[in-house]
Amino acid sequence: MKFFIDTANLEQIREANALGVLDGVTTNPSLMAKEGIKGVENQHKHYIEICNIVDGDVSAEVIATNYEGMIKEGEELAALNPHIVVKVPCIEDGIKAIKYFSNKGIRTNCTLVFSAGQALLAAKAGATYVSPFVGRLDDICNDGVGLVAQIVELYQTYDYKTQVLAASIRNTLHILQCAEVGADVVTCPLSAIKGLLNHPLTDIGLEKFLADYKKVNG
């Protein structure tokens, strides 16, 4: 399973990359706004900076919600760097745009997916990735991980090549559950990635090893 970090913060991306386990980055308009990045030109520069840090796919989202606008923005984003994956919302014009991009050899990430039906259409249109939102489904008492499992099974049944990218990951349990049901990728905050390292017995064991070493070696 691949690990992507869900952020537009360059320092967090560098820190995650330094761990040696980072496979890519996902961003969205909210994350870009959080970093105070204004204007298309500055956004494009920021995407290029991210691509220079990470040797992996970088999802950059279109803002337009109509077909023509998505095509224009998506082609501009794809031209920035070979690592760019154009992120497109799972709406009617989005599915049309994904088909267009697929025919042009431009890779896509179909985002804001909340049902297996949406995921099925995205794969049929040729999406490179599909992003079911685990945490947001859990927030409304639906089974986010269950949706990931359902999509994985559907794709295996019909041999779709679209990768299941579990998004809206809130904690380490989400990561492990998505791994168990066969997600190809999880994208999550740095805190969740680092959280996988934490276990009290590791800390206790290390403390004992060091204490025993000092008894003998001073």
Curated annotation (Swiss-Prot):
Gene3D superfamilies: Aldolase class I. The keyword Cytoplasm applies. One of its GO terms (molecular function) is aldehyde-lyase activity. One of its GO terms (cellular component) is cytoplasm. The active site is at K87. Coiled coil: none annotated. Its EC number is 2.2.1.2. It catalyses: D-sedoheptulose 7-phosphate + D-glyceraldehyde 3-phosphate = D-erythrose 4-phosphate + beta-D-fructose 6-phosphate. Pfam families: TAL_FSA. The keyword Cytoplasm applies. Disulfide bonds: none annotated. It comes from the Bacteria. InterPro entries: Aldolase_TIM (IPR013785), TAL/FSA (IPR001585), Transaldolase_3B (IPR022999), Transaldolase_3B/F6P_aldolase (IPR004731), Transaldolase_AS (IPR018225), TSA/FSA_arc/bac (IPR033919). This is Probable transaldolase. The gene is tal.
